[in-house]
A protein has these predicted regions:
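Beta-strand-rich interaction surfaces with strong enrichment in secreted/lumenal proteins
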Residues: 75, 84-87, 294-299
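Acidic, glycine-rich flexible loop segments
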Residues: 279-307, 311-323
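Short, well-ordered beta-strand segments enriched in hydrophobic/aromatic residues
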Residues: 49, 94-101, 305-311
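N-terminal onset of structured domains
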Residues: 79-95, 100, 106
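Bacterial N-terminal signal peptides that target proteins for export
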Residues: 1-12
């Protein structure tokens, strides 16, 4: 009898292992969330994309990103795998993050205008069949936080609200995009921290957004994805009334800012340029209001991006409770995910599962 029981047990274990190999989702369900510990800072943190001594106190979590949501039909030259090293500190008012990841190229050429030999202007674009660009765009990073209880987030992380379009349909609606973001039922919201190296990075901020259950493109063109409440600022495509050239430029010209128009340099476009010259494709202005809650300093050097991030532990004001994760309970575990966009509009590398952050 004992031998028979042992045989049955062994067979059961073998079959379970075979099922997990055949069905990765089953294996993933057994995977526990990764863990990040935010440690109390002893000294003030200065946002400068450099690790001052205070960061020595925090232990880095390494998160491997090796999943892609889709293959663009016109090619993809971006990274297919990278590892994000992340640390966290906090003080009485703020939570901080220090992130580093390898990216061999600094991608800033987001839809720039190029002067042609015949005197006309052409905006560089190479969109794929989904209407998105993977050639003339920008580097980005996303942090995706569960605000309230989102079913499946702890196990699946970001993937629980990323819905791919299949056979031209998304949630029964005709759609050409590769996928859409939305939660699966009313009341579920996710805080989306989106760093954009061209549109927000030069201004020292993330684009603070959130995701809810909206699936009607008539109600919101970006489906469940929304910007937080703002009182001003933002970014806007730089083209004239008939879209044949830029409307604004930097004056004086700035090589450092050649791919974006800054508020303090913004001037009406005057064409004194020669063939091959570049004018930015985007005009950027700092967000005011909750959409600008997250501060950052970023730097690319020797094939690596470094971001030093700061946000209030708790936010207040209009709709803060449904648009922002609130780090108000130091005994709670906060679940999130990370993704990296290498010169891509929506294509990105991400990880399976979630990360659980606790405070110590």
């Amino acid at each position: 009898m004992k031998t028979a029981r042992k045989s049955i047990l062994v067979m059961g274990l073998v079959m379970t292992a075979m099922l997990m190999i055949a069905n990765p989702l089953l294996a993933e369900d057994k995977k526990a969330p990764m863990k990040l510990v935010s440690v109390k800072a002893d000294t003030a943190i200065t946002l400068d994309a450099m690790a001052e001594k205070a960061w020595d106190k925090a232990t880095a979590l390494e998160v491997k990103l090796d999943q892609l949501p889709y293959e663009p039909n016109n090619g993809y030259n971006g990274i297919r795998e990278t590892t994000v090293k992340i640390k966290s500190l906090y003080d009485d008012k703020y939570v901080y993050f220090y992130l580093q990841y390898a990216d061999p190229t600094q991608s800033l050429e987001r839809f720039p205008w190029i002067k042609q030999a015949d005197g006309s202007w052409k905006q560089s674009k190479k969109k794929d069949s989904t209407g998105h660009d993977n050639t003339y765009y920008e580097d980005k990073l996303g942090m995706y936080w569960e605000i309230n209880k989102v079913k499946g987030f702890k196990k699946k992380g970001c993937a629980v609200s990323c819905h791919l379009t299949e056979e031209g349909l998304n949630n029964g609606i005709a759609d050409t995009s590769a996928g859409r973001k939305y939660t699966n039922k009313p009341g579920e919201t996710i805080d989306m921290w989106h760093w954009k190296s061209v549109r927000t990075g030069p201004l020292g901020m993330f684009d603070d957004q959130f995701v809810d259950d909206v699936t009607d493109p008539k109600a919101n063109k970006n489906w469940g994805r929304h910007g937080d409440v703002k009182t001003g600022g933002g970014y806007k495509n730089n083209f004239n009334a008939d879209k044949t050239g830029p409307a604004f430029m930097n004056s004086p010209y700035s090589e450092k800012d050649k791919y974006w128009v800054l508020p303090e340099l913004k001037a009406k476009f005057v064409d004194t340029f020669k063939a091959g010259d570049v004018v930015p494709g985007i005009v950027i202005t700092p967000f005011t209001g909750h959409r600008g809650d997250i501060k950052v300093q970023s730097a690319w050097k020797d094939g690596q991006w470094t971001l030093e991030v700061k946000r209030a532990l708790a936010t207040t004001g209009d709709k803060a409770e449904i648009q922002d994760v609130q780090f108000s309970d130091m005994a709670k575990t906060y679940y999130f995910g990370i993704s990296v966009f290498d010169n891509s509009q929506i294509n990105h590398v991400y990880h399976e599962g979630s990360i659980g952050m606790t405070f110590k």
